[in-house]
Amino acid sequence: MKTNIISEEEQIEEILTEANSYNLRQEVITTASMFMQDDPELDKVAAYQMAYMEWIK
């Protein structure tokens, strides 16, 4: 049986693709980077999800 596990990079790229549809790709990248700098323990995918949500609200 094949499982559908997508990599961290694929998840981040999906988030950035969605952000790009709002012309917010770079803003999400920058904000995610700031979140990870502020909290080095933060999961990379979670940082991108949080940044995306911050920009599209």
Enumerate the predicted regions with their spans:
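C-terminal alpha-helical interaction appendages
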Residues: M1-K57
